[in-house]
């Protein structure tokens, strides 16, 4: 009888623990990643780019506005 009681306690405690983990997993949010993607999308759709034309390492003229308006883009500097 004692072994049955211990087995039931272990079973219910593991179920309760796994349910707690599942509940906590649902509350984790990642708004920063979503916000970051939206900002990059808005920047890339911006037609009034503050970037000036740049020259690459081969001497070719690069219009950064044609590439993107995101300041993190390679070769695009103010």
Swiss-Prot record:
Molecular functions (GO terms): toxin activity
Keywords: Disulfide bond, Enterotoxin, Secreted, Signal, Toxin, Virulence
Keyword Nucleus recorded: no
Positions of the propeptide removed during maturation: 19-61
Compartments, as annotated in UniProt: Secreted
One Gene Ontology CC term in the entry: extracellular space
Signal peptide boundaries: 1-18
InterPro entries, per database record: Heat-stable_enterotox_CS, Heat-stable_enterotox_STa
Disulfide bridges in this chain: 64-69, 65-73, 68-76
Presence of keyword tRNA processing: no
Family: Belongs to the heat-stable enterotoxin family.
Protein's UniProt name: Heat-stable enterotoxin ST
Lineage: Bacteria, Pseudomonadati, Pseudomonadota, Gammaproteobacteria, Vibrionales
């Amino acid at each position: 009888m004692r072994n049955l009681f211990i087995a039931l306690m272990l079973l219910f405690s593991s179920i309760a623990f796994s349910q707690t983990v599942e509940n906590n997993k649902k509350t984790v949010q990642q708004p920063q990643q979503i916000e970051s993607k939206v900002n990059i999308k808005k920047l890339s759709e911006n037609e009034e780019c503050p970037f000036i034309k740049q020259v690459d390492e081969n001497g070719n003229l690069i219009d950064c506005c044609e590439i993107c308006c995101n300041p993190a883009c390679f070769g695009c500097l103010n």
